[in-house]
């Protein structure tokens, strides 16, 4: 089943005509192994797991056993959505394996049943992930013919030297060109970034952040590099040629990137890999900043930084007024310590106070002469310092 050019390619002639991303989403994921990747990236172990099928079967027109059959796709969709539709925006997602780089016959085999479900109203969208150098105009048109309207690109970095060291096989300009072509077709664009690759510096990370901001994708995912067993990066790590990010470094990088991109109107939909039983148990993980609640740690850091910035301003205010003889007390040597009340929606408790109250512990120990209270009793985040009230 194919869509007409008018029904799909012309869905949204201008990107601003697209409806807003729905808040409630339901993804129906299918993982495509290392079938379309022409490169063996330094951080990826799929080539050693998939072995000959991944590397040799691209010349075959037979559907490899690692791809879902049409019946598998149909059954999985039914399993997710159940007997009746909900208010969720259901989207089939083909992840991994550089989807648009696998043979067209294979793409068609898995896209056709998904597109049929789209036409029947069972699902609301189809997306895939791929490489920037596998998105020529003909590749994009083919995806559109089968109802794909969201494409996620594995960018990883916008520094050519870092991309070369990671053996990505594409460069910065490939990313810029691919995003431009997708925008011409009115598609929704997601970019995946991997802080912590070999050769990265703070300067190169900031330059990547600026380059991504200039591209104005619809959303971004942030995946700090993990050193996985059976990868070139693991070999380099054991040889002392690569140093993995610490958890604190990765959290700080994630907080910076999320703050920067969200300020530019770019949605960051994920920070950190999805927790799995294997990663939680440390199986296959050699080194790197893995945490099952990494995204929550990033939010903790962002709120800690905001509160810290406020405290810096408050202390400066108290100091100036004391120097001007207005009698405002400083933090130290208070006869009656200032009360600091942090109020927030109850649903934001773990973000504001931090996991295991880490933020509360930090501020109470850093400013012991203030009386701190933390309560999930507000409709927004406010901080009352004495008689002063600040809205964050």
Q: How would you label these PLM feature ranges?
A:
Residues 39-41, 228-234, 279-281:
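Short acidic/His/Gly/Ser-rich catalytic and metal-binding motifs that mark active-site loops
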Residues 7-51, 74, 78-100, 129-131, ...:
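N-terminal pre-triad scaffold of radical SAM enzymes
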Residues 33-37, 223-228, 274:
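Short glycine-enriched loops at secondary-structure junctions
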Residues 2-26, 242-392:
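Auxiliary Fe-S-binding modules of radical SAM enzymes
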Residues 46, 78, 82, 184, ...:
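Generic secondary-structure signature for well-ordered alpha-helical cores
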Residues 75-83, 113-117, 142, 181, ...:
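A generic secondary-structure signal
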């Amino acid at each position: 089943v194919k869509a007409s050019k008018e029904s799909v390619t012309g869905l949204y002639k201008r990107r601003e005509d697209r409806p807003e991303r729905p808040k409630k989403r339901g993804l129906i994921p299918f993982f495509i192994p290392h079938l379309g990747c022409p490169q063996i990236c330094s951080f990826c172990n799929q080539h050693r797991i998939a072995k000959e099928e991944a590397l040799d079967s691209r010349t075959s027109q037979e559907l490899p056993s690692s791809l879902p059959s049409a019946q598998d796709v149909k059954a999985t969709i039914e399993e997710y959505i159940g007997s009746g539709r909900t208010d969720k925006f259901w989207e089939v997602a083909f992840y991994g394996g550089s989807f648009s780089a696998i043979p067209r016959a294979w793409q068609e085999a898995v896209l056709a049943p998904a597109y049929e479900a789209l036409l029947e109203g069972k699902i609301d969208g189809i997306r895939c992930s791929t490489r920037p150098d596998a998105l020529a105009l003909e590749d994009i048109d083919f995806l559109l013919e089968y109802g794909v309207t969201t494409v996620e690109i594995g960018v990883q970095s916008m520094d050519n030297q870092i991309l070369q060291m990671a053996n990505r096989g594409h460069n910065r300009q490939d990313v810029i060109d691919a995003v431009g072509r997708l925008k011409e077709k009115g598609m929704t664009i997601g970019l995946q970034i991997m802080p912590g690759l070999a050769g990265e510096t703070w300067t190169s990370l900031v330059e990547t952040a600026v380059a991504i901001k200039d591209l104005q994708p619809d959303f971004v995912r942030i995946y700090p590099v993990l050193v996985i067993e059976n990868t070139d990066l693991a070999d380099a790590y054991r040889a002392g040629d690569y140093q993995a990010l610490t958890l604190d470094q990765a959290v700080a990088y994630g907080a910076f990137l999320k703050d920067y991109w969200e300020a530019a109107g770019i949605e960051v939909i994920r920070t950190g890999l999805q927790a799995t039983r294997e990663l939680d148990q440390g199986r296959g993980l050699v080194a790197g900043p893995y945490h099952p609640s990494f995204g929550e740690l990033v939010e903790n850091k962002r709120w800690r930084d905001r509160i810290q910035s406020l405290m810096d301003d408050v202390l400066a205010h108290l100091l100036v007024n004391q120097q001007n003889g207005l009698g405002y007390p400083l933090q130290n040597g208070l006869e009656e310590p200032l009360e600091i009340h942090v109020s927030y929606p109850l649903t934001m408790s773990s973000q504001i106070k931090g996991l295991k109250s880490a933020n509360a512990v930090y501020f109470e120990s850093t400013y012991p002469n203030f009386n701190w209270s933390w309560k999930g009793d507000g409709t927004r985040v406010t901080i009352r310092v004495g008689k002063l009230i600040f809205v964050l």
